[in-house]
């Protein structure tokens, strides 16, 4: 018997004005498929999910969900009911299940022969769906996703906290088809690993957009690439996609050599042994002088991101000694000591609210430690790229916003054609004329990075630079940071990004303890299990030591 499909698309077309985003798409999805959607920012990835969720009906062709099937959608900016608490919003995901329990309890309170059959049927339903443990299931999901306190007012939550509440509500509802737009944004590594396992074992179909390449590798069995309006399916996970894509590009002979090499580098990295990855990160520190020399001889190219490094660093870069910092009645950082060597790249990890941004503010001098010290070397010139996009002018086009209207951009001691510089951030041809106000979240992030990285500096502070980036720009940014002749301190939840780049990890582990570790993220995780046991990698709500005065 042929397998049934849970969703069908036939001759699907979608355009924004004169720009065709999706062209004559024909796809059908199996009810247990796990599919990752890839493509440049603005290629229509989020649009596909909105059409499938029934939120975008302005298209031609056909798109429909199988009869009787249910669909759930996580948007990049999800809506929560402002009149309800965190728990009230989460419980919306199990409203039908609580109604079953409420009806059963009502029947048992007023038991009669007339309702005996209904009560027995409800008991069978409760048994089959394991609803007796519903409260503990909700509590476990909120714990795993590190949701804010149950009684918290959702109108006071950050964007990341709102997304975790919405994701928790969606997963508890258990729809037949899950549509997830950047589900790992604002999730720490432990929560991301939990979500990976949950989705791998999920009984329904999953379509997801994510820039987390390990997540794609560990969850998906298919990759759908959106390429200039077409949808190209690849069977296999992200590693298999890289190999198949590389072969396809060679056959078509249509891509430039730099893109081909970038794909091959990424494929080799995923295939490399942990020992080989570790030796690469250690080699960076030893080769700082060679990095500086190479940077002096480097010339900007059309297909690469170049980060101007500034002057050579002395032996003192950033040093902390007994650093302690509180916020209100919570101790965020207690007795932290570390020394960043020239050439080092530090990955800063931990849950939202743990104190990562506070650490950045102490490095930049915006905040002072309660006790201890933080020393910035005399040769250090800081460059700071935060998460804010508020400074972007929605009325300017991409080229104007990035270049300031100048034909030449100065990158340290080099000069580069401004349109070529925009192209390095994957804005090519007519894309440079697009209005900033009409861009997707990922495209706005690329504009923001392109503007902020021009200034350079020999120590970069990067706050979640990979959020919403397409995989092409992400790989280009990694290549630029690998060649960067300076230090970087990077807040990120992207494990592959941290594995490829980090020479050290600063991990906010809870109870105000921050662990300084030499090695990349993979090494750190192994060390954490050795120190704290296997349970240490399971997500829990962030905890702080109470502040005593």
PLM features: residue spans?
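ABC ATP-binding cassette signature C-motif
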Residues: 1-257, 301, 307-549
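Intracellular alpha-helical coupling/juxtamembrane segments of multi-pass membrane proteins
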Residues: 244-277, 281-287, 291-298
């Amino acid at each position: 018997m042929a397998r049934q499909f849970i969703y069908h698309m036939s001759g699907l077309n979608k355009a924004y004005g004169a720009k065709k985003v999706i062209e004559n798409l024909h796809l059908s999805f199996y009810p247990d498929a796990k599919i990752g959607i890839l493509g440049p920012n603005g290629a229509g990835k989020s649009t596909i999910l909105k059409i499938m969720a029934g939120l975008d009906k302005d298209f031609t062709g056909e798109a429909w969900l199988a009869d009787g099937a249910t669909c759930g959608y996580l948007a990049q900016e999800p809506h929560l009911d402002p009149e309800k608490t965190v728990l009230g919003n989460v419980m919306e995901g199990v409203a039908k299940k609580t109604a079953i329990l409420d009806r059963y309890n009502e029947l048992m309170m007023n038991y009669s022969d007339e309702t005996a059959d209904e009560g027995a049927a409800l008991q069978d339903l409760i048994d089959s769906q394991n609803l007796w443990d519903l409260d503990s299931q909700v509590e476990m999901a909120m714990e795993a996703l590190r949701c804010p306190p149950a009684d918290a007012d959702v109108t006071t939550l950050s964007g990341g906290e709102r997304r975790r509440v919405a994701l928790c509500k969606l997963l508890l509802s258990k729809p037949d088809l899950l549509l997830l737009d950047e589900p790992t944004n604002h999730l720490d590594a432990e929560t991301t690993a939990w979500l990976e396992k949950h989705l791998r074992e999920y009984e329904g179909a999953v379509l997801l957009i994510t820039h987390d390449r390990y997540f794609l590798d560990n969850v998906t069995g298919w990759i759908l690439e959106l390429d200039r309006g077409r949808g190209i399916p690849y069977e296999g996970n992200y590693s298999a996609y890289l190999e198949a894509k590389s072969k396809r590009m060679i056959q078509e002979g249509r891509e430039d050599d730099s893109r081909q090499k970038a794909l091959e580098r990424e494929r080799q990295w995923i295939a490399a042994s942990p020992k080989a990855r570790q030796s690469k990160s250690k080699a960076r520190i030893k080769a700082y002088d060679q990095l500086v020399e190479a940077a002096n001889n480097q010339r900007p190219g059309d297909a690469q991101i170049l980060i101007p490094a500034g002057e050579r660093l002395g032996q003192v870069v950033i040093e902390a000694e007994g650093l302690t910092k509180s916020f209100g009645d919570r101790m965020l950082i207690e007795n932290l000591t570390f020394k960043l060597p020239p050439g080092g790249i530090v990955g800063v990890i931990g849950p939202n609210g743990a104190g990562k941004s506070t650490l950045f503010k102490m490095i930049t001098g915006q905040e002072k430690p309660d006790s201890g010290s933080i020393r910035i070397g005399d040769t250090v010139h800081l460059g700071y790229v935060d998460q804010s996009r508020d400074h972007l002018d929605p009325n300017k086009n991409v080229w104007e916003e990035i270049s300031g209207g100048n034909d030449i951009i100065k990158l340290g001691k080099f000069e580069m054609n401004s349109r070529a510089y925009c192209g390095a951030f994957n804005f090519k041809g007519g894309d440079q004329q697009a209005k900033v106000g009409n861009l997707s979240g990922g495209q706005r992030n690329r504009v923001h990075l392109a503007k902020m990285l021009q200034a350079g500096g020999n120590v970069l502070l990067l706050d979640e630079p990979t959020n919403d980036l397409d995989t092409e720009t992400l790989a280009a940014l990694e290549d630029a940071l690998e060649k960067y002749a300076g230090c970087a301190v990077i807040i990120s939840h992207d494990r592959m990004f941290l594995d490829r780049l980090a020479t050290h990890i600063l991990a906010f582990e809870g109870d105000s303890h921050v662990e300084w570790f030499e090695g990349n993220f993979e090494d750190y995780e192994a060390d954490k299990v050795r120190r704290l046991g296997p349970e240490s990698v399971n997500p829990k709500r962030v905890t702080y030591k109470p502040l005593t005065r």
